[in-house]
From Swiss-Prot:
Main location: cytoplasm
InterPro entries: Ribosome_recyc_fac, Ribosome_recyc_fac_dom, RRF_sf
Stretches of the chain forming a coiled coil according to its record: none
GO molecular function: ribosomal large subunit binding
CDD domains: RRF
Family the entry assigns: Belongs to the RRF family.
GO annotation, biological process: translational termination
Protein name: Ribosome-recycling factor
Organism: Clostridium botulinum (strain Okra / Type B1)
One cellular component (GO) term of this entry: cytoplasm
Signal peptide: none
Annotated Pfam families: RRF
Superkingdom of origin organism: Bacteria
Keyword annotations from UniProtKB, A to Z: Cytoplasm, Protein biosynthesis
Length: 184
């Protein structure tokens, strides 16, 4: 029973790290990255469809994203979706492809992005601590099942070690992203 709780903690904490990495990948860092467009959806034949399912997204130059839709009729919908997004990019539609030029980041913009990165990191840490609390509650409930105090204490220590490991990983991911943003 304790092993299952520890496994559940590991899985949930791992998913939190994956979600954090995905979230950070979509943040602008002054260079083109197709992941920036992952959360943008365009209306296509009546339903909202992610841009990466509407066409090919490539990076021909360091600060240029090129979107080649498989269906040319989707060009205007893709353009509207990009304009509505919070990325602040101006799409250039030439009738066959959409070009997105990623502007140079100002110092102020960089600092704002770093603040957002730190906030996102803190949210991930809160999620990890919440998972720790839930797992510790599950372990404490095992007292009813005649599990020894020593086993419960050891399980709580193991959960704390996992928590510390994942929080340390979050810190390193956040500091790497900050360096990436500030060094460009």
């Amino acid at each position: 029973m304790i092993k299952e709780i520890l496994k559940k903690a590991d899985e949930k904490m791992g998913k939190t790290i994956v979600a954090l990495k995905r979230e950070l990948a979509s943040m602008k860092a002054g260079r083109a990255n197709p992941a920036m467009l992952d959360r943008i959806e365009a209306e296509y034949y009546g339903s909202m469809t992610p841009l990466n399912q509407l066409g090919n997204i490539s990076v021909p130059e360091a600060r240029v994203l090129l979107i080649q839709p498989w269906d040319k009729s989707a060009l205007s919908a893709i353009e509207k979706a990009i304009l509505k997004s919070d990325l602040g990019l101006n799409p250039s539609n030439d009738g066959t492809v959409i070009r997105l030029v990623i502007p140079e980041l100002t110092e102020e913009t960089r600092k704002n992005i770093v603040k957002t990165v730190k906030k996102t990191g803190e949210e991930a840490k809160v999620a990890i601590r919440s998972i720790r609390r839930d797992c510790n509650d599950d372990v404490k409930n095992l007292k009813k099942d005649d599990v020894s105090e020593d086993d419960i204490k050891k399980a709580e220590d193991d959960i704390q070690k996992k928590t510390d490991k994942y929080i340390k990983e979050i810190d390193s991911i956040i500091s790497a992203k900050e360096k990436e943003i500030l060094s460009i």
